[in-house]
Structures are given as structure tokens and as C-alpha cells.
Amino acid sequence: MPASPGHRDVLGCLVAACVPVQPGNPSRRSMLQQSLRAQILVLLGGSLAALLLIALACFGSLTGDVRAYRELLGGPVRAAQLIDEANLQFRGQVQEWKNVLLRGRQTEAQTKYWSQFEAQERAVQDILGRLGSVAEGELKDRVERLREEHRRLGTAYRQGRQRFLEAGADPIAGDQAVTGIDRATTAQMQTLRDELHQASDLHSSSISAEARRTMLLGSLVLIGASLAVALLSLWLVNRNLVRPVQRLIEHIAQLSHGDFGERIEIRRKDELGKLALAANTLRDFLVDIFDRLRRSTRDLDSASGSLNAIASLMAAGTREQFSRTDQVATAMQEMSATAQEVARYAGDAARAADEADDSAQRGEDVMEETIRSIGEMRKEIDHTVEVIRQLESDSGRIGKVLDVIRGIAEQTNLLALNAAIEAARAGDAGRGFAVVADEVRTLAQRTAESIAEIHQIIDTVQNGAVNAARAIESGQSRSEAGAEQVANAGAMLRQITASVESIRDMNRQIATAAEEQTAVAEEISRNLTEIASIASSNQEQVEQTEAASRDLHGLSAQLGDALQRLRA
């Protein structure tokens, strides 16, 4: 519907109240009279300027503390940091010397750790040099003495390294050469570190106390000035803004009660004056609106009947939608319960597959250990067979030697027999020789008997060796067959493991799919429940619409009565 002239007047006044006014008079007083925003900005600007001057004064008092703090950071604090860094690097240097002694037996390792030692030494010298550059007076002399002491310590360590190398990389010799030489340097560095930290802490405490005093004084001054500015601003705002606004509120309250008889008097040219002009325009606009409402009430009465019929049709459709949605939600809940059962069974199957896979893995490990044991036993059997065969060969050689000895014994026996015959022919002259020949023959017979017994024992040993070799060879063939069977069993276990792994993956996929299906079903069920709830809510709203449409006719009548109460 096009805007009425009264409506356009209200909009123009409201825009004029929001847009800054560009005054034609260039004087500052005219600008302040025509712009409430300028008055507020002047008030706020003056307040902020006063607070800014006070803050600048406080900031100026803090500048000296900031400068002192910067000097602290560049002087004592920096010196304390450098001495801490030098102390840390010196400990690293001592540690690298221990690495040279303990791990430098090989040339490559000794060179590596000695290079690291020299790098740590250079780092300490560099840090002490930087500390000397920032130090002054007695502190600088002490730093130079410490640096010179550290150089002498490096010379002593190099002499100790030379003794270490001359002693064939003996760590005891190297350690004895440098025992206690780092104590003086360590003590000087620790003393200097404690003094620097103490000086830094004292200086920092002094600066902090001064800064706290300055901040406290500045805060008190700033708070007092802020209270004074706030009270002055409150008085000015109450006189120039609050009281005129209260008068406007009273006039608008009369408009809200339907009293359009009086117009507000306008004496100001700023935004509040424009707001008063807009209130008068609003009063004219409302009078026109109430005339239009009287005409619209009649049209509203006729439209309420049509709305009631449409609401009845919507109520029937909503009840049918609610019934169908409830049935689908019940089916989705049943499907979700079924999917949860499938996921649980798939999870149980996956856990069972995991247990079977673990058992198969343990069985495979046992099989592999058995195969290794059989292989080692087969090697031992091969070695035993070789030893037995060597024993058989040695027994054969011994038998040959015994055959030679037996032949010699038989020849000796024949010679002794011939000697006895010759001694008997010689009579008394050969009696002594006959006794000796008889003894020789007796010894030859005993030798032959012993050789026969030894030969019998060797035959027994050879037979036993042959039987043992055959038995071991038979056991070896059986162990090879057993090893092959164990290997086949291991292969089958690996196949079982792979199959169980595949089953486990499939069970997990099934469980995942079932869980996803459950989640989707639950989401659908929730959505259906929400749809059912929305349908129920829509049904209630449609029923309310039906009731509202029935009451709409009565309300239009009441509206007509209310319009009669307005006083133009």
C-alpha cells in the first residue's frame, strides 16, 4: 500500500533526527545550538582532553622507570644471562672431556668428541668476550681474569689429552692428568654468576618499587579527575538532555493513551527539537491511521470466515500426516534395533577372530621354533654320523695294525720254537737259551691271544658303529620328514592366520556398516520424531488458528469499539 503524506512526513523527520545537520551559519555557537551531537561531542571531547592530559602526565612520570628498566635489561640482566650461558657451555665442555676419556678409544670417536670439546671451549670464550664488552670497571677485569683462567684450563686439558694418547687411550691416565684443574674456574664462574644475579635482582626490585609508587599516584590522580569530570558531565547532561527528553516522553505517553488533542511546543533547533517536530507529525499520522483502521475492520470481519474454512482443511491434513509419520518412526526404531544386534554379533565375531588369530600366531611361532630345533638336531646328527664313520675307519686301521702285530707274534713264536729246538740239541750248553726261548714263546702266545681279544673288541665296536650309523641315518631321515611336516603345518597355520585376518577385516567392515546403518536409522528416527512433533505442533497451531478465526469476528467488533474511544 503506498505511503500516505503523513507517513512520509514522519519518515522525513526521523531521518532528519538521525542525519547530522550541516549548519549554514559558520559560527560555533550556532552549530552547538542546532546539533545535540555536537554538544555531546564537545562535552565528551573536553572530558577526554582533561583525562588525556592527566594520563600524559602519568606516562611522563613512568618514562623514567621504563628507561631504567631498559638499562636493566641491557646491563645487569644481560650480564646475568651471559654468565648463565657461559656456565652451561662450560659444563658441556667438561662433559665432552669425559666423553673423550670414556668413549675415545677409537681414533674416529676420539676425534669427534675432541672436536666437540674445542667447540664448547670456543663457545665459552665467545660468551665471556661478549660479557666483557657489556661489563665495566671491576666487573670487566674479573671477566677478563676468568677468561684467561679458562684459556689456561684449555691448555691443561690439551696436555691431559696428550698423556691420554701416550698411555694408549687409557682414561685413568687422562683423568689423573687433569684431576681438579677445573675447580678454580668453576668456583670463579659460580661466584661471578651469584653476584650478577644478586645485582640484577636488587636493581629490578628498586625499579619495580618506583614504578608501583608512580602507578599508584597516577591512578589516584586519574580517578579523582575522572570523578570530577563525570560529575560535571552528569550535571550538563541532566540540564540539556534529560529534562527535555522527559517532557517529550510525557507527550508521547499522552499519544499512547489515545489523547491526540494537544501538540507539543517546539523551541529548540537541535535533534531534540526535530524529535518534537517528529512527535507532532506522528500525532497527525496516527489520526490518519485510526481512520483507516475503521475502514479495515469491516474487511477483516469478512475475511475471518474464509480463514476458518481453510484452517479446518489444514487440521485434517495435519492429523493424517501425524499418523503416517508415527508409523514410519516405529518401523525405523525396529530397524535400528536390528542393526544394533548385527553390529554386536559382528563385534563378537571380530573379537573371536582376533583370539583365533592370536592363537594361530602363537602356534606359528612354536612351529618356527620347532623347525629351528629340528634343523639344529639334524646338524648334530650329521656330525655324530661323521664321528661314527671316522671311528669305524680308525677301528679298521687298528685292526690292520693288530694283524701286523699278530703276524709278528706268530713269527716270534716260530723263532722261539726253533730256538728251543736248537737249545735242546745243544744239551746243557743251550739250556739257558732254551729257557729264554720258552719265555719268548710264552710272551708271543700271550701277545697273540691279546691281539685276538682286541681284534674281537674292534669287530664289536665296528659292528656297533655301523649299526649306530644306520640308526642315526634312519633317525635323520625321520627328522627330515618330521621337519617337512612341521614346515607344512607352519604353512597351514600361516594360511589360517591370513584367513582369520580376512575374516576379522570382514567382520569389522560388517560391524562398521551396521554401526553406520544404526546411526543413520537413529538419525532418521530422530528426524521422524521431530517431524511428528512438528506435525503435532502444527495440528495444535491449526486448531488454535481455527479458534482464532472464530474469535476474529468478535475481535474486529472489539476493535471498532476501541477506535471509538480515541479522541482526535
Curated annotation (Swiss-Prot):
Residues that span the membrane, as ranges: 40-60, 217-237
Record-linked Pfam families: HAMP (PF00672), MCPsignal (PF00015)
Example of a GO biological process term: signal transduction
GO cellular component: plasma membrane
Record's subcellular location: Cell inner membrane
UniProt keyword terms in alphabetical order: Cell inner membrane, Cell membrane, Chemotaxis, Membrane, Methylation, Transducer, Transmembrane, Transmembrane helix
Gene3D superfamilies: HAMP domain in histidine kinase, Methyl-accepting chemotaxis protein
SUPFAM superfamilies from the UniProt entry: Methyl-accepting chemotaxis protein (MCP) signaling domain
Residue intervals annotated with topology Cytoplasmic: 1-39, 238-568
Entry similarity comment: Belongs to the methyl-accepting chemotaxis (MCP) protein family.
Function comment: Chemotactic-signal transducers respond to changes in the concentration of attractants and repellents in the environment, transduce a signal from the outside to the inside of the cell, and facilitate sensory adaptation through the variation of the level of methylation. Chemoreceptor for inorganic phosphate, which is required for taxis at high concentrations of phosphate. Recognizes inorganic phosphate directly. Can also bind to other components that have a pyrophosphate group, including ATP and ADP.
Annotated protein name in UniProt: Methyl-accepting chemotaxis protein CtpH
UniProt organism field: Pseudomonas aeruginosa (strain ATCC 15692 / DSM 22644 / CIP 104116 / JCM 14847 / LMG 12228 / 1C / PRS 101 / PAO1)
